[in-house]
């Protein structure tokens, strides 16, 4: 195993397929492992570069491999896809990951820390609750409109519900349903506030987040999102690369000497 220079791992939930190659790019070893057996195998390998797609479980695996002395590299799946040379299977995917990682111009994803992943989970749950809150008010608007009652857009239906029920003769079961939706809305609001408080506490412990908060007009949600998704930003060669990665610049589709910028 001393001649292994690069390992590509196709990550799965319970099975992991690896493709190993030497410095010349020649395949020297490939095998399927379970999660415990993979860690056991890599713990006995000399320190080397290990490439994976940036997908579910990849950031945990990157931290684990770094603890074993290896150099983990995460690649966006869209950059791996062009290197699949034949019919798709797990070993072919692992080989394509190796091929992509060996390119000098390849761009890699920075592995997230445990704290970043935990903060990202808070953001995703909060986003889901916000969507549920909007869905709840939309349902209430729709139910009332079916009975000829029009209420201004937004959360006005929540604050005016008692008056609406008093002024209009609605079926009892519908009134009870609307009151349940109102209670659900208030529950969602409390849950969102609780998550935002947790995000603020997490951000107080984050050095990058505190620096971001010093920027005018940057608040808790923006700072925690950037800190979670971007990290310290060392993976970007310049501020222009950061702007392009976050979608703050137009998408380019130029050909034949003609420049075309898309939205």
Q: Could you say what each language-model-derived stretch is?
A:
Residues 1-263:
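A detector of single, family-specific signature residues
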């Amino acid at each position: 195993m001393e001649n292994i220079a690069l390992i590509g791992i196709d990550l799965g939930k319970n099975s992991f397929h690896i493709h190993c190659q030497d410095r010349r790019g020649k395949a020297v070893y490939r095998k399927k492992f379970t999660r415990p057996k993979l860690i056991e195998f890599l713990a006995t390998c000399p320190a080397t570069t290990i490439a994976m797609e940036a997908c579910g479980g990849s950031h945990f695996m990157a931290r684990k491999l770094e603890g074993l002395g290896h150099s983990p590299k995460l690649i966006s799946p869209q950059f791996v896809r062009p290197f699949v040379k034949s019919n798709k299977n797990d070993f072919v995917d692992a080989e394509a990951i190796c091929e992509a990682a060996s390119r000098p111009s390849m761009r890699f994803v920075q592995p997230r820390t445990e704290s970043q992943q935990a903060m990202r989970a808070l953001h995703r749950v909060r986003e889901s609750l916000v969507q549920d809150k909007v869905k709840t008010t939309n349902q209430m608007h729709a139910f009332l409109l079916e009975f000829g009652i029009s209420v201004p857009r937004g959360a006005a239906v929540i604050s005016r519900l008692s008056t609406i029920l008093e002024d209009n003769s609605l079926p009892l079961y519908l009134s009870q349903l609307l009151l349940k939706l109102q209670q659900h809305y208030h529950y969602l609001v409390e849950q969102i506030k609780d998550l935002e408080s947790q995000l603020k506490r997490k951000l107080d412990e984050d050095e990058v987040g505190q620096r971001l908060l010093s920027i005018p007009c940057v608040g808790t949600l923006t700072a925690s999102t950037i800190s979670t998704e971007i990290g310290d930003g060392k993976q970007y060669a310049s501020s222009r690369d950061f702007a392009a990665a976050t979608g703050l610049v137009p998408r380019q589709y130029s050909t034949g000497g003609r420049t075309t910028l898309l939205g």
